[in-house]
């Protein structure tokens, strides 16, 4: 597998799965999926082997690293991938153990005994488990030494004096307070961070009201540490040991992604997903779910007693009855509204959205851009808009009025064909006149012979800018599809009385027609936003460059003892006042035509400007 064949990965925590022929050969977890997977392709050794053998990569996003650890462990146990050889046997996995004592302590162990202790795991990443233990040891005052009760009472240790232990070994611990700490640690390790955070915040506020600011500060640090590592809730499992499937759906135009997670014994052990095409034309979430259920569950070898859905669909009762008869027991389809099960569905929804975005980006990268087909359909274009040109203006109170033109082909920027225009003959802000002039120069000047006509023109602006561009098209006798994109609500401005089809109507009087508002995830809108953002940045950066050059020239005109040749030489070597002011005297003196005396004069002049409050 090559790096260029990877799906577009999010920069978020999760689990990634290298597969060969559909079989997992390596499963790993990451705090940042994008960075971690990229590292495998740069490394040699074992990473080089499984990246070379893999023919696909899959990923599951999680809320935090702890959840990723748990999910990774369950998937490795389920699939036993070849290149996770060191982690295959459960007896080698590290567990976190809360001992069964009057004052429990937290330890890392690789043996699970029937000793009444509470075990959490297994975890395949020993270093990450130690980090979790270190955080709990630092922030929760559990005892750190073993062997209670002691024959001889020791002196209080450093942890006690630092507030990191309640001191049971010196009989200083309140059993009730210690029990509360133990309950907090259990809740965190079971994935119930939210109530712990809420209680810690309440205790912190109470300490502050009592003016015990040292204790309030400790509690504040504890809250921040818990929120950073655990988030507000864990979602990789539920507390009860149950079997169920939970589904998530994401849609973008005619494309949809359904992801199904299998939860067995209260823990996620696997996932299936489908990338669906043809969901356009009014298909709602229920219809997409119905199509997936029909495809998946008619082939499934095991159906759990409960299937959680993000939305209801019309045939759910029929499918529930069919699957119940097939399984020989009741199979329920439910749409949870609150609680643990609703949060499982929310996890599936997030992963479906991330998976859909990844699939769409991969299609775009391979040239099979779904947004171009969506644009053709939405705008009733005669052809797929392979080449799109975007236009925007930039100025500050009418000075240095410029326009930018960017070119996209196949959904990707073609920066070698981007162009910048200095708007001529305008000394006051007039966005409409600037747009008219820019379109006219593009269609009738030298660029008309150098560049092919686009399949679509996008104007960054509202009705006024679109009308000005249409006038320029009409004057140049060019009929190219044109739309605007207004920043407010990302509204698409359509030309012509006959909606978006004016370019198909010969003899139609051109004017601004209606507006179109698409969902933000719609592939067509994604394309237009990408072009708009590129041209806006391009025009603004050009305007800033001209503004800086103008300011630099005006300052150079005032430099004492610096003639025209030296000014031109300095302008060639220094692109901004900041660059010139920061340069040492020796660098300025090295500019052709300059000498040490002239350079010192320049530095002195700029220093005086700064001292007088004039910005450089």
Swiss-Prot record:
Protein name: UvrABC system protein C
Phylogenetic placement of the source organism: Bacteria, Thermotogati, Deinococcota, Deinococci, Deinococcales
Subunit structure of this chain's protein: Interacts with UvrB in an incision complex.
Pfam families the record matches: GIY-YIG (PF01541), HHH_5 (PF14520), UVR (PF02151), UvrC_RNaseH (PF22920), UvrC_RNaseH_dom (PF08459)
Gene Ontology terms for molecular function: DNA binding; excinuclease ABC activity
NCBIfam families xrefs: uvrC (TIGR00194)
Domain spans labelled GIY-YIG: 11-85
PROSITE patterns (alphabetical): GIY_YIG (PS50164), UVR (PS50151), UVRC (PS50165)
Alphabetized PANTHER family for the sequence: UVRABC SYSTEM PROTEIN C (PTHR30562:SF1), UVRC/OXIDOREDUCTASE (PTHR30562)
UniProt record, GO biological process: nucleotide-excision repair; SOS response
Keyword Nucleotide-binding appears in the UniProt entry: no
Subcellular location: Cytoplasm
Role noted for this protein: The UvrABC repair system catalyzes the recognition and processing of DNA lesions. UvrC both incises the 5' and 3' sides of the lesion. The N-terminal half is responsible for the 3' incision and the C-terminal half is responsible for the 5' incision.
Record's GO cellular component terms: cytoplasm; excinuclease repair complex
Disulfide bonds: none
Family: Belongs to the UvrC family.
Keywords from the UniProt entry: Cytoplasm, DNA damage, DNA excision, DNA repair, Excision nuclease, SOS response
Domain UVR positions: 194-229
UniProt organism field: Deinococcus geothermalis (strain DSM 11300 / CIP 105573 / AG-3a)
Source organism, top-level taxon: Bacteria
